[in-house]
UniProtKB/Swiss-Prot annotation:
Residues spanning the membrane: 29-49, 188-208, 218-238, 247-267, 310-330, 337-357, 401-421, 499-519
EC class: oxidoreductase
Residues binding CoA: 720-726, 877-879, 1019-1020
Protein name per the record: 3-hydroxy-3-methylglutaryl-coenzyme A reductase 1
Organism in which the protein naturally occurs: Saccharomyces cerevisiae (strain ATCC 204508 / S288c) (Baker's yeast)
């Protein structure tokens, strides 16, 4: 239902703040809610199942003499004395009250077995037997539940209530009860109830289906049901146990489906959908925590939640007041109102805590995925751990779970329901079993008793004849049942012990505390991110202060000369923001001790050998480097501080390379996260190179708008591509098609003879060889999957080209590991012992080099992008003509490139756009060589321009490499493709390839239009040239000016 008034959203703020509080402390809220709900649950169960008592007796043990008392009531009792002629039937009460000196019990036992070889046991006190029936006469009512025969067969009395596997019998009894009630009810009422239950089950099914569409797993849907069930039990407890309003089980059975259908789960579904979508949209930007996501979700949907529930609550209260003379209806309306009230309470508490927990699990899972991907892509584990702590992604989908896991989850739930059903309903289940296993009709005295009564029963006597008791041989499943029941019985007895119960309670408390601790530990990244953002903002403000206020003295008197202006080093401080590093603190220590000498080299070497390098000053560490005692590459490991290592390396190189520029700040190095660089992006780091980053867009690609970042130092490039975006959008945007996705690696091997090389090629080309190599290759990674191996021979050299999917990573390192292992398996397992691996990379890939194989076969992502530009847009925006553009494209991009013998270069300047986007997004700039392979086609269609770019070898990734750096990662966030995709690995990288192709499309369109109109040189002169500084007026007279003019003419002629 839409909001009825505008201020409704403000009403949701209180419950939104409650949901944020719950999201920050999910374990506490969940435990507290479940404990309260469990108390209400036990109270309600005790109310409805009044035979079940909350005492210390185990639910698996019966009360003393319970079976004997029940059997005595079911016996047929007969009395005789000397004054009576024959036997008189009496009741059980009379049999227990009459003072007869002798009371005998006649047990009627039947041994029934489908196996005729099973022998019937021999029993004492047998007075009569016929076929499979034995009569036992004894003076006490004791029935053996198990009897053994001479051949070892064990017989069991089937009236034992502890039968977990008699489902068929129980089903029959329930069916009989159900049939009897249905036949007595009105057909129209039955139809309504059946319809209501069908709608209720459909609503529950819709809950799971809708949750699955949002990307949720099974447990979030189940938690929604638990939330509603808790509301039901709390409402029942308040209504019946506190208010004393009785709601019968029949009323609850009839009315509950209508409540479920009317209220439904739509609000919880929308809250979960908003939260999960928000989590995916935020991606890896680290600007929002899980409790903030939950807060926004409840704020968005909370208004409608309050509105719908309050309307229903008022309706039920009004109905209860209007129909107060109908007690059953009134009580049910009160119950329904309380159900909705507790729904309003539990949704921002229990359900929000569950949702926050789910988001936290997504974050943890995302961390694991990123760490594994980075390690497989060649990033050192320490750096991978650093990145995975700050950048996390989730992968979870109910449909992607294995069938075994789903079955196990469902089995746990069904087991829980069955245990409750079995324990709490034990009494009436026992009655149902007895009605089937016992013949409860009144049993007459057998002839062998009545005929010999005068001889055997001369005095007063009572004979109680039991119903027919059935014994059956024990089967294998019953032995399993016995083991299960024995285990449960022992556990139940152990838990009742006063020491064990306290131990279990202590273990529960410890478990809850540990879970809280572990969850808080998993959420450290959230608080860490928030603290870092706050520190960054504070640092930015501090760095905006005027530079003239800096009073810190400099280390040297050297100056930085720029043009004709001279400025001291103190004014050349970097203006980049971020927290100060330990190297700056060490610099201050160096400044304070300028008059102190550096310790002797021998003493420094001793400290280095003892592992105390961190205690040295930067100048002392630099001295060790200068004297060759400490390698440049080992500074990060020895100092344990990447930023300090960069500072020391700059000091040392400024002397070793005689490069005083490194002692200045012209190449910045401060306030940069070198932890992400170490072991992943660069070695011997001395700083970072700032590049200007522009943005083009919005550019509509396949119906979605993107702003595309470009890092470049070429003027007009961003402006030109921006004009292309405007023209493409005017035609409805760009359309893309991805035709291939597979990174390649091409090893080269050698065999002793050409025949062996040829045989190996034939084997690799066969289905057997392909499958064998795929199995070996795929075992090396959870992401890389081998698609195909292409081979070729050159003499005895065999070249192989492995084509592999690599998820969202660019994947060169990932493939190299798989190729290396596959070649090893060929030598060791597949019979190619004489194969010699010449190189893991034989340039048959081909990587970072122009090659026709990449142009023909493709490498990485093969994308075709197309757009239709209306004719009037070509004229007004591009300032050109459709026919002129088509003619220019043919002459320049097709004929001109062919005349130059180009391979993959049938375009105007695809490399310009590809390189600029690669630099901005942390891609490998060297792979611009093959990624820029592109053919641009244009044609006129009904007066409009249709332009397309076909790029068969775009090599990109959204995780690993330069994407781990924060600035580049931020630009990937701008596009919404950072890190691995949550549910479909490879989707983000493929989308990035589409974006790159469309950026090239915009650039091609604009440049070709500029060339066709002759605007290229003019635009570069306008944007790339600064206006000349005005010259000072001279004092030349007219005679001198005329002389200079004549001289210039003479010079030109000569």
């Amino acid at each position: 239902m839409p909001p009825l008034f505008k201020g409704l959203k403000q009403m949701a703020k209180p419950i939104a703040y409650v949901s944020r509080f719950s999201a920050k402390r999910p374990i506490h809220i969940i435990l507290f809610s479940l404990i309260i709900s469990a108390f209400a649950y036990l109270s309600v169960i005790q109310y409805y199942f009044n035979g079940w008592q909350l005492d210390s007796n185990s639910v698996f043990e019966t009360a003393p003499n319970k079976d004997s008392n029940t059997l005595f009531q079911e016996c047929s009792h007969y009395y005789r004395d000397s004054s009576l002629d024959g036997w008189v039937s009496i009741t059980a009460h009379e049999a227990s009250e009459l003072p007869a000196p002798h009371h005998y019990y006649l047990l009627n036992l039947n041994f029934n077995s489908p196996n005729e070889t099973d022998s019937i046991p021999e029993l004492a006190n047998t007075v009569f037997e016929k076929d499979n029936t034995k009569y036992i006469l004894q003076e006490d009512l004791s029935v053996s539940k198990e009897i053994s025969s001479t051949d070892g067969t064990k017989w069991r009395l089937r009236s034992d209530r502890k039968s977990l596997f008699d489902v068929k019998t129980l089903a029959y009894s329930l069916y009989d009860v159900f049939s009897e009630n249905v036949t007595q009810a009105d057909p129209f009422d039955v139809l309504i109830m059946v319809t209501a239950y069908l709608m209720m089950f459909y609503t529950i099914f819709g809950l799971f289906n809708d949750m699955r569409k949002t990307g949720s797993n099974f447990w979030l849907s189940a938690s929604t049901v638990v939330n509603s069930a808790s509301s039901l039990f709390l409402a029942l407890y308040v209504t019946q146990c506190i208010l004393g309003k009785e709601v019968s089980a029949l009323t609850l059975f009839e009315g509950l489906p209508f409540i479920v259908v009317v209220v439904g789960f739509k609000h919880k579904i929308k809250i979960a959908q908003y939260a999960l979508e928000k989590f995916e949209r935020v991606g890896l930007s680290k600007r929002i925590t899980t409790d903030e996501i939950v807060f926004e979700s409840v704020s968005e949907e909370g208004g409608r939640l309050i509105q719908d529930h309050l309307l229903c609550i008022f309706a039920f209260i009004g109905c209860s007041m209007y129909a107060h003379q109908l007690k059953t209806l009134t009580n049910f309306c009160i119950l329904s109102a309380f159900i909705l009230i507790f729904e309003l309470i539990l949704t921002p508490t229990f359900y929000s805590a569950i949702l926050a927990l789910r988001l936290e699990m997504n974050v943890i899972h995302r961390s694991t995925i990123i760490k594994q991907t980075l390690e497989e892509d060649g990033v050192v584990p320490s750096t991978a751990r650093i990145i995975s702590k700050a950048e996390k992604k989730s992968v979870s989908s109910f449909l992607n779970l294995s069938v075994v896991v789903i079955i196990m989850k469902l089995s746990v739930i069904l087991l829980f329901v069955f245990i409750n059903f079995y324990n709490f309903g034990a009494n009436w289940v026992n009655d149902a079993f007895n009605s089937l296993y016992f013949d409860k009709e009144r049993v007459s005295l057998p002839d062998f008793i009545t005929s010999n009564a005068s001889e055997n029963f001369k005095e007063q006597a009572i004979v109680s004849v039991t119903p027919l008791l059935y014994y059956k041989p024990i089967k294998s499943y019953q032995r399993i049942e016995d083991m299960v029941l024995l285990l449960l019985r022992n556990v139940s007895v152990a838990i009742r012990d006063r020491f064990v119960s306290k131990l279990v309670l202590s273990a529960l408390v410890c478990s809850a505390v540990i879970n809280v601790y572990l969850l808080n530990a998993a959420r450290i990244h959230t608080s860490y991110t928030a603290d870092q953002l706050v520190k960054t903002e504070v640092t930015k403000k501090s760095f905006t202060a005027p530079v003239q206020k800096a009073s810190t003295p400099v280390l040297t008197n050297k100056t930085v000369i720029s043009g004709s202006k001279v400025k001291s080093l103190s004014s050349a401080q970097s203006s980049s923001s971020g927290p100060s590093s330990s190297s700056e603190e060490d610099d201050s220590r160096d400044i304070e001790s300028l008059d102190k000498k550096i310790r002797p080299l021998e003493e420094l070497e001793a400290l280095l050998s003892s592992g105390n390098t961190k205690q040295l000053k930067n100048k002392e560490v630099a001295a060790l480097v200068i004297h060759g005692k400490l390698p440049l590459y080992a500074l990060e490991k020895k100092l344990g501080d990447t930023t300090r290592a960069v500072a020391v390396r700059r000091k040392a190189l400024s002397i070793l390379a005689e490069a005083p520029v490194l002692a200045s700040d012209r190449l910045p190095y401060k306030n940069y996260d070198y932890d992400r660089v170490f072991g992943a992006c660069c070695e011997n780091v001395i700083g970072y190179m700032p590049l200007p980053v522009g943005v083009i867009g919005p550019l509509v690609i396949d119906g979605t708008s993107y702003h595309i970042p470009m890092a470049t130092t070429e003027g007009c490039l961003v402006a030109s591509a921006m004009r292309g975006c405007k023209a493409i959008n005017a035609g409805g945007g760009a359309t893309t098609v991805l035709t291939k996705d597979g990174m390649t690696r091409g090893p080269v091997v050698r065999f002793p003879t050409l025949k062996r090389s040829g045989a190996c090629k034939i084997w690799l080309d066969s289905e057997e060889g392909q499958n064998a190599i795929k199995k070996a290759f795929n075992s090396t990674s959870r992401f890389a999957r081998l698609q195909h191996i292409q081979t070729c021979l050159a003499g005895d050299l065999l070249f192989m080209r492995f084509r592999t999917t690599t998820g969202d990573a660019m994947g060169m390192n990932m493939i190299s590991k798989g190729v290396e292992y596959s070649l090893k398996q060929m030598v060791e397992e597949y019979g190619w012992e004489d194969m010699e691996v010449v190189s893991v990379s034989g340039n048959y890939c081909t990587d970072k080099k122009p090659a026709a194989i990449n142009w023909i076969e493709g490498r990485g992502k093969s994308v075709v992008a197309e757009a239709t530009i209306p004719g009037d847009v070509v004229r007004k925006v591009l300032k050109s003509d459709v026919s002129a553009l088509v003619e220019l494209n043919i002459a320049k991009n097709l004929v001109g490139s062919a005349m130059a013998g180009s391979v993959g270069g049938f375009n105007a300047h695809a490399a310009n756009l590809v390189t600029a986007v690669f630099l901005a997004l942390g891609q490998d700039p060297a792979q611009n060589v093959e990624s820029s392979n592109c053919i641009t086609l244009m044609k006129e269609v009904d007066g409009d321009l249709r332009i397309s770019v076909s790029m068969p070898s775009i090599e990109v990734g959204t995780i690993g490499g330069g994407t781990v750096l924060e600035p580049q990662g931020a630009m990937l966030d701008l596009l919404g493709v950072r890190g691995p995709h949550a549910t479909a690995p490879g989707t983000n990288a493929r989308q990035l390839a589409r974006i790159v192709a469309c950026a090239v499309l915009a650039g091609e369109l604009s440049l070709c239009a500029a060339l066709a109109a002759g605007h290229l040189v003019q635009s570069h002169m306008t944007h790339n040239r600064k206006p000349a500084e005005p010259t000072k007026p001279n004092n030349l007279d007219a005679t001198d000016i005329n002389r200079l003019k004549d001289g210039s003419v003479t010079c030109i002629k000569s």
